[in-house]
Amino acid sequence: MPKNIVFPSRKERMFGWIYALLGVELLPYILNFICSGVGITLTGSQLNLAYFVVNFLVVCLVFRRFWVRTGKAVLDRILWCVLMAAAFFAVYLLLSQSVGRLIFWLKPDFANANDRHVAAIADSYYIPTLVCTVFLVPMTEECLHRGAIFGGLFKRNIAAAYAVSTIIFALVHINWLVGDPFVILLSFLQYIPAGLCLAAAYHLSGSITAPILIHMAVNAIGILALR
């Protein structure tokens, strides 16, 4: 286990907190406003893809020094990162299956609304959706949720870092849902295994590379299953 975890700087973490809690929610409205202002009409799917790309570019720009530090450090621990990614990917699969069985027992007709949303986008733009969900989204979300939020709390309280980063990660994926509160609760529960395993992979590998690899693998399984 590496002695030092590569975290974003204090300024990067501050931006990450603000952007994860506010910017991510406001960006779709900002994009829509800009497109309307210049006379461009986008479908819902096109707007979502634009959202993924702009989100990624903003995070890359702000966290550019963090990416440089991560790139330098990962060369010394690449095998350990891959090992941790493989280990926690396996743990995620086990936990996810267990939670899935519980959800099926509680509500046999449950379906993940976020998955249906991505499937609808992929139905019209499969390759762009694959690129965004497998590559851009994992790098963006890991920078924000593990790098900024988990990293911002880690030195103060490790348990809080795990709990808060996992809860916010889950909420971001369901905050647009409306309807049956029980279904929303089950949707929230579905993201807990991923949040915990991604945080643990970052903690024990010492590099954001490990959770990014896991996140990419999970999303790849989901998007390839749509083919």
Model regions and ranges:
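Juxtamembrane/transmembrane-helix boundary motifs at the membrane-water interface
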Residues: 26-50, 101-106, 177-183, 220, ...
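Alpha-helical transmembrane segments in multi-pass membrane proteins
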Residues: 17-65, 112-120, 128
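Residue-level signature of transmembrane alpha-helical entry/exit and packing/kink sites
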Residues: 13-21, 44, 48, 52, ...
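Interfacial transmembrane-helix boundary/kink motif in multi-pass membrane proteins
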Residues: 2-23, 65-97, 101, 154-160
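Structural signal for the C-terminal ends of transmembrane alpha-helices
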Residues: 60-70, 201-204
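Alpha-helical transmembrane segments of multipass membrane proteins
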Residues: 24-32, 51-59, 88-96, 165, ...
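Juxtamembrane helix-loop-helix connectors linking adjacent transmembrane helices
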Residues: 40-41, 68-137
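Transmembrane helix-loop-helix hairpins at the membrane interface
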Residues: 124-227
